């Protein structure tokens, strides 16, 4: 088995500050990356910023600042988001970096040498906001791009990529690789778009300067999407024998928003085929967020600042809500009341309550120690229904993650916590203390073990809080991988637990 795993977010466009959509994509990708590390994979997790193009140049001009200084400032705000959201990326690529420009030039030359790029003249509609070209037939009745972006008529010399040549090859590839695009609804949209006919794509501009110059023809700037998509290989050191390229490419998963799926599922694989580069294995397109049922936009003044949410509720609480509230791939609605309800009813009432009740009882009634039981008794405990449920946890959740059904993993965790809360109520260790002390110890051990399973499975989602849970339980820091969720790595009988503290406070 290949033990490497390469996952990417899209690189984020730096014409504005980070918002909830950036946070959502980043957290989802981070959860997957952390999950794969816990499975024992050697993970490469990439994020970064897309810093070229007409939109960035205009934004810099409007602020009366040099484009490089502008991108330096805005790129830093995305780095700050990654730190604030506890994103565990292994690399952060900027398209203004030398390593990226060098790789793009090599990639361009490969396309040129293979006869897939030619010179011509572009005349048509272009949306600066989307950095995308559109046919007349794609415009709305109001003459806007499908995204609602205004378009302008562009006439200029251009290099073209012979996208039309790759139409049949793309359709053959989609057919042979049904898991290439997720979810299936997005896959069907892409196939329909490609079947409707592909036209050759303009891949250079001459009407602005902020971008990577075309090799040997500096009047042209490479189209921002060709430049940007190449980040996935430039960050690995494309064609550099000493780099990570041979180790990690092709990517296992590109996580993208549904608005940029066409670029990733049509243009990118066509570019790669033309450059004789293996294609990524899966592209996962997630949905958009609304705010209290309204479309989020600057004009409505209802953008959601993830940093402010973290400051108010805590990073793990925000991470949990984003992953729990929505089926990954579907659209979601941000409602403050729903965020508070998720935190209080699930993190605090179900997981936090179970942890507090169990550890407090052990701390006060068993000298702050994991019950000292024989292996025979521990084996008997593992035959309890609740431990049987926990024992199937890893296998079930790996299958769900393989299908990127992230919120269902959290549903499993909450269900197990509910089952454990029912178990503690029905067994009533506070009564057993008087009537059957040995049985009390068995019940406490079972509950502590269930909490160990829950905490390790929560590590990808709420890493800081889950590690605090494991610290309270006295779990060795070297025994917090999925491979440790078996009977061989049970809590050490007689070991100490920490004095309980509240990890999941409630909010009003």
Swiss-Prot record:
Disulfide bridge map: none
GO CC annotations on file: cytoplasm
Sequence motif 'KMSKS' region, location on chain: 295-299
Intervals of motif 'HIGH' region: 12-22
Keywords per UniProt: Aminoacyl-tRNA synthetase, ATP-binding, Cytoplasm, Ligase, Nucleotide-binding, Protein biosynthesis
Top-rank EC class of the record's enzyme: ligase
Protein's job: Is required not only for elongation of protein synthesis but also for the initiation of all mRNA translation through initiator tRNA(fMet) aminoacylation.
Listed name of the protein: Methionine--tRNA ligase
Organism expressing this protein natively: Rickettsia conorii (strain ATCC VR-613 / Malish 7)
């Amino acid at each position: 088995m290949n033990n490497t795993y390469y996952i990417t977010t899209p690189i984020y466009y730096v014409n504005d500050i980070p918002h909830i959509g950036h946070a959502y994509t980043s957290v989802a990708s981070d959860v997957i990356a952390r999950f794969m590390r816990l499975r024992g994979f050697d993970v490469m997790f990439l994020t970064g910023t897309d810093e070229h193009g007409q939109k960035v140049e205009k934004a810099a001009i409007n602020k009366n600042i040099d484009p490089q200084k502008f991108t330096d400032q805005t790129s830093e705000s995305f780095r700050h988001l990654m730190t604030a959201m506890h994103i565990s990326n292994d690399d952060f690529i900027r398209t203004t970096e030398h390593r990226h420009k060098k790789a793009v030039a090599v990639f361009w030359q490969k396309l040129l040498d293979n006869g897939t790029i030619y010179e011509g003249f572009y005349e048509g509609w272009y949306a600066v906001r989307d950095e995308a070209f559109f046919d007349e037939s794609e415009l709305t009745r109001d003459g806007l791009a499908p995204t609602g972006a205004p378009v302008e008529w562009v006439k200029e010399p251009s290099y073209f990529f012979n996208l039309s040549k790759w139409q049949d090859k793309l359709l053959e590839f989609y057919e042979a690789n049904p898991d290439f695009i997720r979810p299936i609804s997005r896959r069907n949209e892409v196939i329909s778009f490609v079947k409707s006919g592909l036209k050759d794509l303009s891949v250079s501009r001459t009407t602005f300067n902020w971008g990577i110059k075309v090799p040997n023809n500096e009047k042209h700037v490479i189209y921002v999407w060709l430049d940007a998509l190449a980040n996935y290989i430039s960050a690995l050191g494309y064609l550099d024998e000493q780099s990570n390229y041979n180790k990690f490419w092709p990517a296992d998963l590109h996580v993208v928003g549904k608005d940029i799926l066409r670029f990733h599922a049509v243009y990118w694989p066509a570019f790669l085929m033309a450059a004789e580069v293996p294609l990524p294995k899966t592209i996962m397109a997630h949905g958009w967020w609304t705010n209290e049922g309204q479309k989020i936009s600057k004009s409505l003044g209802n953008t959601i600042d993830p940093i402010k949410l973290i400051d108010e509720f805590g990073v793990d609480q925000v991470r949990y809500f984003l992953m729990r509230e929505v089926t990954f791939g579907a659209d979601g609605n941000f409602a403050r009341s729903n965020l508070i309800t998720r935190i209080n009813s699930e993190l605090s009432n179900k997981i936090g309550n179970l942890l507090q009740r169990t550890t407090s009882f052990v701390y006060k009634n068993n000298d702050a120690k994991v019950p000292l039981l024989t292996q025979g008794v521990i084996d008997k405990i593992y035959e309890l229904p609740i431990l049987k449920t926990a024992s199937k946890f890893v296998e079930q959740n790996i299958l769900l993650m393989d299908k990127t059904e992230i919120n269902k993993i959290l549903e499993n965790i909450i269900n197990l916590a509910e089952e454990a809360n029912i178990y503690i109520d029905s067994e009533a260790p506070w009564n057993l203390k008087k009537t059957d002390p040995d049985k009390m110890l068995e019940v406490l051990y079972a509950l502590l073990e269930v909490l160990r399973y829950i905490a390790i499975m929560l590590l990808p989602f709420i890493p800081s809080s889950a590690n605090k849970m494991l610290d309270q339980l006295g779990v060795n820091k070297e025994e917090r991988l999925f491979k440790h969720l078996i009977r061989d790595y049970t809590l050490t009988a007689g070991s100490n637990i920490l004095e309980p503290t509240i990890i999941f406070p409630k909010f009003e």
